[in-house]
Amino acid sequence: MELTDADLVARVLVDDDQHAFGELVRRHQSAVRGLLRQLTRTDVALADDLAQQAFLRAYKNIRNFRGEARFSTWLYRIAYNCFREDARRRKELVGIDEEQIQRQQDPQVTDPGLRHDLMRALNLLPLNERSAVLLCCQNGLSHDEAARVLDIPLGTVKTNVLRGREKLKRMLADWGPN
C-alpha cells in the first residue's frame, strides 16, 4: 500500500525520516520543475536551481506545514516564492531560448509547431496571468489552490486564468494558418 503525502509528512515530522521526504521529492519534483521552467521562460538550469532551493526550504520548514491544503499546494507556494525572489533580483530579464522551447516535451501537445507557438504565447502573457494559467491549466490545481500558492484572492485567480486563456486563444488563432 502506497503512503499518502500526509503519511509521509507525518513520518518526516515524527521520526525525521529523510527517506519519507525523499519520496515526497520524487513524487513532486517533475511538477515543481515543470512549473518553474514555465515561469522562468524555459531556463532549465535556473528552474532546476530554484526547484532545489524550494525542496531545501520545504525540508527546513516542514514543521510549518499545517495541513490546511495539500502538500503539493504548499510546495508550489514555496517554489513560486523562490521564483519571485529570484525574479526580483534579476528584474525578470530572462528571455526566450528557442532551442530549449523546441526540446520542451509537453505530453499534452504533440505537434512541435503548436508546442513552440504555445510556449511563445505563454511567455508573452503578463506574469500574473501566466502563473495562474500554468498552475490551473497545466499543473491541475483548483482555482482555490492556485489562490493559496499565489497568495491572491480567488476572484483574481479566476480573472487571471480567464484573461490568460482568452489571450492565448487569440494569439494562437492569429499565428495559425490563414
Residue ranges and their predicted role:
Residues E2-D7, E85, K91-R115, R120:
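Internal acidic/polar
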Residues M1-R26, S30-A31, R170, P177:
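N-terminal module of bacterial RNA polymerase sigma factors
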